Amino acid sequence: MVHGAADISMREFDPRRFGDYATKDWQVIKAKEDYCLRHEIPFPHFNRLAGRPIKPSPLYDRLKDAGAVFEEVYGHERPRWFARDGVAQQDHYSFCRNEVHVMVGTEVAAVRNNVGTMDITAFTKVEVTGTGSAEALQRLVANRLPRKDGGVILTHLLNRRGRIEIEVTVIRLAGDRYYLVCAAFFEQRLLDHLANHGGDGLTVINRSTGWAALALQGPKSRAVLAEVTDAPLDNAGFRWLSARQIGIAGHDVWALRMSYAGELGWELHGPAENMLAVYDALWAAGEAHGIANYGSFAMNAMRMEKGFKGAGELTNEVTLPEADVMRFVNLETGDFIGRDETIASQQAAEAGTMPWICAYLAIDADGKADGHGGEAVMHDGRVVGSTSSVAYGHSVGKVLAFAYIKPEAAAPGTALEVVVMNEARKSVVLGEAAWDPQNLLPRTDG
């Protein structure tokens, strides 16, 4: 820990899990709330409401009127799900499925079949510029930086032990100007990593509060976007995993053609004061296409269907080979932080001596409870690991999970059991994504 890289994940104790929004008055409010909640049942996704909202996005009121039930992430108000059909606009706590499960399924279906929008303003958004910024960033990331303006990559920042500190999307805006996007609660950790390891030539601008962002996802997203911008949107004019500035409702935004939902889609990033007008324009154009709002619960279900890893899997307790994300690594880029340790871990994997690996599982559904992460995984009557993320895949009708398990139990097709609420459920290791395994949908032309 004294070297900046603890052996275990310290997220729950890291003071950087709070930002400058955590003023003295806010701390007093939350301390009182904590005392009042001392004997409450610790339901999954328990939502602490005191001292909120403190960092509402420009869309907060509009989404609240649309039925949003919010969660707080690093001070930001992010929609979890949207109440409709007489369901109360409040948290509904349970260890099992309830009416929220149905609401989330409706949101997933809207994105998969038509088009949906999500307020993703909570993401950490940082701009990096300066002479030599490319060289400095290349020493920090495990993938090759984009070589052309508008290029987009997914990569990881590692510590000196080769463990994962942060997963980050890097966009080359122009020349030596880069835009970095990662999870909300990594904001200060990303800023610290850049300050500690980036060198003196970097200029870092934190856009996390000044900019807002929207996701527009689904097979009809291109049709909706085409009604509000003159920019080319086909594959020839706007390729998959690329970015460019486009105009919407009289405002310039950065459009990133990428999708955490695994569909044709874009993320739209720009100054916060303009994003409500952008949202309203998209909705006016999208009503004829069945546009719907969706929240983080639906987003999580869809990323699980696609086999995309998240914060539960990518911690500073594991290496890139252990997390099974080596497809996002380029070892030929030079001596990035953690490179030698990554190679050593890869060699351990090849030798069969790696302690664990992140496996993708399908679990039998009982229609009542799906699990929440932390469930024991069994093979031939013995514990071989535990789940890190679990969600019901509404599009595929399966409970899906990521789990860190012994490598000998991780081969695709291996029969396992996962203990959900004290009941052993049949499970199997998957070798490909449950939804669109060839990843064709995000690349759809038109």
Locate each region found by the language model.
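Conserved, structured C-terminal
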Residues: 3-8, 42-72, 78-80, 84-86, ...
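A short acidic-Thr-Gly-centered motif at the start of a beta-strand
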Residues: 107, 170-171
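Acidic, proline/glycine-enriched N-terminal capping motif
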Residues: 13-158, 163-165
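Polyanion-binding and phosphate-handling cores
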Residues: 1, 11-13
